[in-house]
Amino acid sequence: MDERLLSGESGYEDADLEYSLRPQTLRQYIGQDKAKHNLEVFIEAAKMREETLDHVLLYGPPGLGKTTLANIIANEMGVNIRTTSGPAIERPGDLAAVLTALQPGDVLFIDEIHRLHRSIEEVLYPAMEDFCLDIVIGKGPSARSVRLDLPPFTLVGATTRAGALSAPLRDRFGVLSRLEYYTVDQLSAIVERTAEVFEVEIDSLAALEIARRARGTPRIANRLLRRVRDFAQVRSDGTIAMEITQMALELLQVDKLGLDHIDHKLLLGIIEKFRGGPVGLETVSATIGEESHTIEDVYEPYLLQIGFLQRTPRGRIVTPLAYEHFGMEMPKV
Protein backbone atom coordinates (compact mmCIF):
# COMPACT_ATOMS: atom_id res chain seq x y z
CA MET A 1 0.00 0.00 0.00
CA ASP A 2 1.29 3.49 -0.84
CA GLU A 3 2.56 5.67 2.02
CA ARG A 4 -0.39 7.91 2.58
CA LEU A 5 -0.63 11.31 4.21
CA LEU A 6 -4.41 10.92 4.51
CA SER A 7 -4.43 7.49 6.11
CA GLY A 8 -6.27 7.28 9.42
CA GLU A 9 -3.87 4.54 10.56
CA SER A 10 -1.29 5.54 13.14
CA GLY A 11 2.40 5.92 12.28
CA TYR A 12 5.35 6.28 14.64
CA GLU A 13 5.34 10.07 14.29
CA ASP A 14 1.60 10.15 15.06
CA ALA A 15 2.03 8.04 18.20
CA ASP A 16 4.54 10.43 19.79
CA LEU A 17 2.43 13.48 18.96
CA GLU A 18 -0.86 11.92 20.06
CA TYR A 19 0.64 10.97 23.43
CA SER A 20 1.69 14.58 24.08
CA LEU A 21 -1.68 15.96 22.93
CA ARG A 22 -3.90 13.36 24.59
CA PRO A 23 -6.66 14.84 26.81
CA GLN A 24 -6.88 13.30 30.26
CA THR A 25 -10.60 13.72 30.97
CA LEU A 26 -13.90 13.52 29.10
CA ARG A 27 -14.36 17.25 29.69
CA GLN A 28 -11.15 17.99 27.76
CA TYR A 29 -12.05 15.62 24.93
CA ILE A 30 -13.34 17.39 21.79
CA GLY A 31 -16.11 15.76 19.74
CA GLN A 32 -17.92 12.40 19.96
CA ASP A 33 -20.57 14.03 22.15
CA LYS A 34 -22.98 11.09 22.15
CA ALA A 35 -20.35 8.51 23.12
CA LYS A 36 -18.79 10.92 25.60
CA HIS A 37 -22.05 11.74 27.39
CA ASN A 38 -23.01 8.07 27.66
CA LEU A 39 -19.60 7.12 29.03
CA GLU A 40 -19.84 9.97 31.54
CA VAL A 41 -23.06 8.45 32.95
CA PHE A 42 -21.77 4.86 32.95
CA ILE A 43 -18.49 5.82 34.65
CA GLU A 44 -20.22 7.93 37.31
CA ALA A 45 -22.74 5.14 38.01
CA ALA A 46 -19.97 2.54 38.37
CA LYS A 47 -18.07 4.81 40.77
CA MET A 48 -21.20 5.46 42.85
CA ARG A 49 -21.76 1.70 43.18
CA GLU A 50 -18.03 1.12 43.78
CA GLU A 51 -18.00 -1.39 40.92
CA THR A 52 -15.85 -1.86 37.86
CA LEU A 53 -17.18 -0.34 34.65
CA ASP A 54 -18.87 -2.77 32.26
CA HIS A 55 -16.69 -3.96 29.39
CA VAL A 56 -16.58 -1.35 26.59
CA LEU A 57 -16.31 -1.83 22.82
CA LEU A 58 -15.22 1.25 20.86
CA TYR A 59 -15.62 0.92 17.10
CA GLY A 60 -15.36 3.12 14.03
CA PRO A 61 -12.85 4.26 11.38
CA PRO A 62 -9.17 4.66 12.34
CA GLY A 63 -7.86 7.92 13.79
CA LEU A 64 -11.03 9.00 15.63
CA GLY A 65 -9.73 8.66 19.20
CA LYS A 66 -10.44 5.11 20.39
CA THR A 67 -7.08 4.77 22.16
CA THR A 68 -7.49 8.22 23.70
CA LEU A 69 -10.94 7.30 25.03
CA ALA A 70 -9.61 4.07 26.53
CA ASN A 71 -6.98 6.04 28.46
CA ILE A 72 -9.59 8.59 29.55
CA ILE A 73 -11.84 5.79 30.85
CA ALA A 74 -8.98 4.55 33.05
CA ASN A 75 -8.22 8.10 34.24
CA GLU A 76 -11.87 8.83 35.04
CA MET A 77 -12.17 5.55 36.96
CA GLY A 78 -8.92 6.29 38.81
CA VAL A 79 -7.28 3.00 37.79
CA ASN A 80 -4.30 1.81 35.76
CA ILE A 81 -4.49 0.79 32.10
CA ARG A 82 -2.70 -2.13 30.48
CA THR A 83 -2.46 -1.86 26.69
CA THR A 84 -2.00 -4.61 24.11
CA SER A 85 -3.38 -5.51 20.68
CA GLY A 86 -5.05 -8.43 18.93
CA PRO A 87 -2.02 -9.32 16.77
CA ALA A 88 0.30 -9.22 19.83
CA ILE A 89 -1.67 -11.97 21.61
CA GLU A 90 -0.60 -15.02 19.62
CA ARG A 91 -1.30 -17.81 22.13
CA PRO A 92 -3.71 -18.37 25.04
CA GLY A 93 -0.68 -18.19 27.33
CA ASP A 94 0.00 -14.61 26.18
CA LEU A 95 -3.51 -13.59 27.22
CA ALA A 96 -3.24 -15.47 30.52
CA ALA A 97 -0.03 -13.59 31.35
CA VAL A 98 -1.73 -10.24 30.72
CA LEU A 99 -4.87 -11.11 32.68
CA THR A 100 -3.08 -12.47 35.75
CA ALA A 101 -0.97 -9.29 35.98
CA LEU A 102 -4.04 -7.05 36.34
CA GLN A 103 -4.84 -5.31 39.62
CA PRO A 104 -8.44 -4.95 40.91
CA GLY A 105 -10.36 -2.41 38.82
CA ASP A 106 -7.70 -2.10 36.10
CA VAL A 107 -8.57 -1.39 32.47
CA LEU A 108 -7.26 -3.84 29.88
CA PHE A 109 -7.21 -2.17 26.46
CA ILE A 110 -7.01 -4.47 23.44
CA ASP A 111 -6.60 -2.56 20.18
CA GLU A 112 -7.58 -4.31 16.92
CA ILE A 113 -9.56 -6.77 19.00
CA HIS A 114 -11.16 -8.21 15.85
CA ARG A 115 -7.78 -9.81 15.06
CA LEU A 116 -7.83 -12.09 18.10
CA HIS A 117 -7.72 -15.78 17.17
CA ARG A 118 -10.90 -17.69 18.01
CA SER A 119 -9.02 -19.97 20.44
CA ILE A 120 -7.91 -16.88 22.38
CA GLU A 121 -11.45 -15.46 22.35
CA GLU A 122 -12.62 -18.64 24.09
CA VAL A 123 -10.14 -18.02 26.92
CA LEU A 124 -11.47 -14.48 27.17
CA TYR A 125 -15.15 -15.43 27.58
CA PRO A 126 -14.99 -16.67 31.23
CA ALA A 127 -12.54 -13.87 32.06
CA MET A 128 -15.07 -11.26 30.91
CA GLU A 129 -18.15 -12.95 32.36
CA ASP A 130 -16.98 -14.51 35.61
CA PHE A 131 -13.52 -12.97 36.18
CA CYS A 132 -11.87 -16.35 36.07
CA LEU A 133 -9.39 -18.11 33.83
CA ASP A 134 -9.49 -21.78 32.83
CA ILE A 135 -6.02 -23.10 32.04
CA VAL A 136 -4.98 -26.60 31.03
CA ILE A 137 -1.99 -28.10 32.82
CA GLY A 138 -0.14 -31.01 31.25
CA LYS A 139 -0.74 -32.87 27.99
CA GLY A 140 -2.56 -35.95 26.82
CA PRO A 141 -4.53 -38.18 29.23
CA SER A 142 -2.92 -36.56 32.28
CA ALA A 143 -3.97 -33.03 31.30
CA ARG A 144 -6.28 -31.29 33.73
CA SER A 145 -8.10 -27.97 33.81
CA VAL A 146 -7.48 -25.51 36.62
CA ARG A 147 -9.62 -22.44 37.26
CA LEU A 148 -7.88 -19.27 38.46
CA ASP A 149 -9.78 -16.34 39.93
CA LEU A 150 -9.04 -12.95 38.40
CA PRO A 151 -9.53 -9.52 39.98
CA PRO A 152 -12.53 -7.60 38.60
CA PHE A 153 -11.39 -5.58 35.58
CA THR A 154 -12.79 -3.64 32.62
CA LEU A 155 -11.94 -4.78 29.10
CA VAL A 156 -11.95 -1.96 26.56
CA GLY A 157 -11.77 -3.28 23.02
CA ALA A 158 -11.17 -1.13 19.94
CA THR A 159 -11.84 -2.11 16.36
CA THR A 160 -12.31 -0.61 12.92
CA ARG A 161 -14.31 -3.70 11.93
CA ALA A 162 -17.04 -4.43 14.47
CA GLY A 163 -18.65 -6.87 12.03
CA ALA A 164 -15.51 -9.02 12.11
CA LEU A 165 -15.97 -9.76 15.83
CA SER A 166 -17.61 -13.06 16.65
CA ALA A 167 -21.12 -12.71 18.08
CA PRO A 168 -20.21 -14.38 21.42
CA LEU A 169 -17.40 -11.88 22.00
CA ARG A 170 -19.44 -8.86 20.90
CA ASP A 171 -22.33 -9.88 23.17
CA ARG A 172 -20.08 -9.84 26.24
CA PHE A 173 -19.54 -6.08 26.00
CA GLY A 174 -21.99 -4.12 28.14
CA VAL A 175 -21.19 -0.78 26.49
CA LEU A 176 -20.90 -0.38 22.71
CA SER A 177 -19.88 3.05 21.40
CA ARG A 178 -19.54 3.92 17.72
CA LEU A 179 -17.19 6.81 17.03
CA GLU A 180 -18.29 9.09 14.19
CA TYR A 181 -16.36 11.33 11.83
CA TYR A 182 -15.74 14.81 13.29
CA THR A 183 -17.33 18.03 12.06
CA VAL A 184 -15.18 20.74 10.46
CA ASP A 185 -15.68 23.00 13.50
CA GLN A 186 -14.55 20.26 15.89
CA LEU A 187 -11.47 19.55 13.77
CA SER A 188 -10.68 23.25 13.55
CA ALA A 189 -10.70 23.46 17.37
CA ILE A 190 -8.36 20.45 17.51
CA VAL A 191 -6.00 22.03 14.94
CA GLU A 192 -5.88 25.29 16.93
CA ARG A 193 -5.17 23.40 20.16
CA THR A 194 -2.37 21.42 18.50
CA ALA A 195 -0.87 24.63 17.06
CA GLU A 196 -0.86 26.04 20.59
CA VAL A 197 1.09 22.99 21.80
CA PHE A 198 3.51 23.49 18.89
CA GLU A 199 3.83 27.16 19.93
CA VAL A 200 3.07 28.23 16.37
CA GLU A 201 0.68 31.01 15.38
CA ILE A 202 -2.21 29.94 13.16
CA ASP A 203 -4.91 31.96 11.42
CA SER A 204 -8.45 30.77 12.22
CA LEU A 205 -9.23 30.55 8.48
CA ALA A 206 -6.12 28.41 7.96
CA ALA A 207 -7.23 26.09 10.77
CA LEU A 208 -10.62 25.76 9.06
CA GLU A 209 -8.96 25.00 5.72
CA ILE A 210 -6.90 22.19 7.25
CA ALA A 211 -10.02 20.89 9.01
CA ARG A 212 -12.02 20.82 5.74
CA ARG A 213 -9.39 18.61 4.10
CA ALA A 214 -8.84 16.27 7.06
CA ARG A 215 -11.55 13.75 6.14
CA GLY A 216 -13.33 14.12 9.47
CA THR A 217 -10.35 12.59 11.29
CA PRO A 218 -8.28 14.26 14.06
CA ARG A 219 -5.18 12.17 13.32
CA ILE A 220 -5.19 13.39 9.70
CA ALA A 221 -5.84 16.99 10.79
CA ASN A 222 -2.81 16.95 13.09
CA ARG A 223 -0.67 15.29 10.41
CA LEU A 224 -1.64 17.94 7.84
CA LEU A 225 -0.91 20.66 10.39
CA ARG A 226 2.62 19.30 10.88
CA ARG A 227 3.30 19.39 7.15
CA VAL A 228 1.79 22.87 6.69
CA ARG A 229 3.91 24.08 9.62
CA ASP A 230 7.01 22.89 7.71
CA PHE A 231 6.03 24.98 4.68
CA ALA A 232 5.25 27.98 6.88
CA GLN A 233 8.69 27.83 8.50
CA VAL A 234 10.66 27.29 5.28
CA ARG A 235 8.65 29.27 2.71
CA SER A 236 7.15 31.99 4.94
CA ASP A 237 7.60 33.71 8.30
CA GLY A 238 6.51 30.72 10.42
CA THR A 239 2.93 31.87 10.86
CA ILE A 240 0.36 29.46 9.43
CA ALA A 241 -1.76 31.80 7.32
CA MET A 242 -4.39 30.98 4.71
CA GLU A 243 -2.16 31.56 1.67
CA ILE A 244 0.69 29.28 2.81
CA THR A 245 -1.83 26.66 3.96
CA GLN A 246 -3.53 26.49 0.57
CA MET A 247 -0.19 26.36 -1.22
CA ALA A 248 1.12 23.57 1.03
CA LEU A 249 -2.01 21.45 0.70
CA GLU A 250 -1.99 21.80 -3.09
CA LEU A 251 1.67 20.72 -3.21
CA LEU A 252 0.80 17.79 -0.94
CA GLN A 253 -1.92 16.82 -3.47
CA VAL A 254 -4.75 17.12 -0.96
CA ASP A 255 -7.74 18.65 -2.71
CA LYS A 256 -10.48 20.82 -1.22
CA LEU A 257 -12.54 17.81 -0.08
CA GLY A 258 -9.57 15.95 1.38
CA LEU A 259 -9.13 13.58 -1.56
CA ASP A 260 -5.62 12.56 -2.57
CA HIS A 261 -4.04 10.87 -5.61
CA ILE A 262 -5.17 7.42 -4.47
CA ASP A 263 -8.81 8.51 -4.20
CA HIS A 264 -8.52 10.09 -7.64
CA LYS A 265 -7.00 6.90 -9.05
CA LEU A 266 -9.81 4.78 -7.65
CA LEU A 267 -12.67 7.02 -8.75
CA LEU A 268 -11.24 7.91 -12.16
CA GLY A 269 -10.38 4.26 -12.78
CA ILE A 270 -14.05 3.32 -12.38
CA ILE A 271 -15.20 6.34 -14.42
CA GLU A 272 -12.78 5.96 -17.32
CA LYS A 273 -12.63 2.18 -17.64
CA PHE A 274 -16.10 1.11 -16.51
CA ARG A 275 -18.26 4.14 -17.34
CA GLY A 276 -18.77 4.80 -13.63
CA GLY A 277 -19.82 1.25 -12.75
CA PRO A 278 -21.25 -0.92 -11.43
CA VAL A 279 -17.99 -2.83 -11.16
CA GLY A 280 -16.94 -5.60 -8.76
CA LEU A 281 -14.46 -5.05 -5.94
CA GLU A 282 -11.98 -7.60 -7.29
CA THR A 283 -12.01 -5.87 -10.68
CA VAL A 284 -11.36 -2.49 -9.04
CA SER A 285 -8.54 -4.13 -7.06
CA ALA A 286 -6.88 -5.46 -10.22
CA THR A 287 -7.38 -2.14 -12.03
CA ILE A 288 -5.68 0.11 -9.47
CA GLY A 289 -3.21 -2.46 -8.10
CA GLU A 290 -4.41 -2.50 -4.49
CA GLU A 291 -5.64 -5.40 -2.37
CA SER A 292 -9.42 -5.65 -2.11
CA HIS A 293 -9.48 -5.54 1.71
CA THR A 294 -7.35 -2.37 1.63
CA ILE A 295 -9.80 -0.73 -0.77
CA GLU A 296 -12.75 -1.80 1.38
CA ASP A 297 -11.31 -0.90 4.78
CA VAL A 298 -9.02 2.07 4.03
CA TYR A 299 -10.02 3.87 0.83
CA GLU A 300 -13.77 3.44 0.48
CA PRO A 301 -15.20 4.55 3.88
CA TYR A 302 -14.58 8.26 3.31
CA LEU A 303 -15.74 8.11 -0.33
CA LEU A 304 -18.96 6.48 0.89
CA GLN A 305 -19.28 9.05 3.67
CA ILE A 306 -19.14 12.02 1.27
CA GLY A 307 -21.42 10.34 -1.26
CA PHE A 308 -18.88 9.88 -4.07
CA LEU A 309 -19.23 6.09 -4.18
CA GLN A 310 -22.03 3.59 -3.70
CA ARG A 311 -21.81 -0.09 -2.82
CA THR A 312 -24.57 -2.06 -4.51
CA PRO A 313 -25.25 -5.81 -5.00
CA ARG A 314 -23.98 -5.37 -8.57
CA GLY A 315 -20.77 -3.59 -7.56
CA ARG A 316 -19.28 -0.13 -6.98
CA ILE A 317 -20.87 2.89 -8.65
CA VAL A 318 -19.38 6.40 -8.87
CA THR A 319 -22.07 9.00 -8.09
CA PRO A 320 -22.99 12.26 -9.87
CA LEU A 321 -21.30 14.18 -7.02
CA ALA A 322 -17.94 12.66 -7.94
CA TYR A 323 -18.41 13.49 -11.63
CA GLU A 324 -19.21 17.07 -10.64
CA HIS A 325 -16.10 17.24 -8.43
CA PHE A 326 -13.90 16.23 -11.38
CA GLY A 327 -15.75 18.55 -13.78
CA MET A 328 -16.93 15.60 -15.88
CA GLU A 329 -20.28 14.72 -17.38
CA MET A 330 -21.95 11.44 -16.51
CA PRO A 331 -22.28 9.05 -19.46
CA LYS A 332 -25.77 8.81 -20.88
CA VAL A 333 -27.45 5.45 -20.37
Swiss-Prot record:
Q: Where does ATP bind?
A: 21-22, 63, 66-68, 129-131, 172, 182, 219
Q: Where is this protein primarily located? A: cytoplasm
This entry carries the following GO cellular component terms, namely: cytoplasm; Holliday junction resolvase complex
EC code(s) of this entry: 3.6.4.-
Region span, Small ATPAse domain (RuvB-S): 183-253
Location of the protein in the cell? Cytoplasm
Mind telling me which InterPro entries this protein's record contains?
A: AAA+_ATPase, AAA_lid_4, DNA_helicase_Holl-junc_RuvB, P-loop_NTPase, RuvB-like_N, RuvB_C, WH-like_DNA-bd_sf, WH_DNA-bd_sf
What is annotated about its quaternary structure and interactions?
Homohexamer. Forms an RuvA(8)-RuvB(12)-Holliday junction (HJ) complex. HJ DNA is sandwiched between 2 RuvA tetramers; dsDNA enters through RuvA and exits via RuvB. An RuvB hexamer assembles on each DNA strand where it exits the tetramer. Each RuvB hexamer is contacted by two RuvA subunits (via domain III) on 2 adjacent RuvB subunits; this complex drives branch migration. In the full resolvosome a probable DNA-RuvA(4)-RuvB(12)-RuvC(2) complex forms which resolves the HJ.
Q: What is this protein called?
A: Holliday junction branch migration complex subunit RuvB
**Source organism per UniProt:** Bacillus mycoides (strain KBAB4)
The organism that produces this protein has a lineage beginning with: Bacteria, Bacillati, Bacillota, Bacilli, Bacillales
Q: Which gene encodes it?
A: ruvB
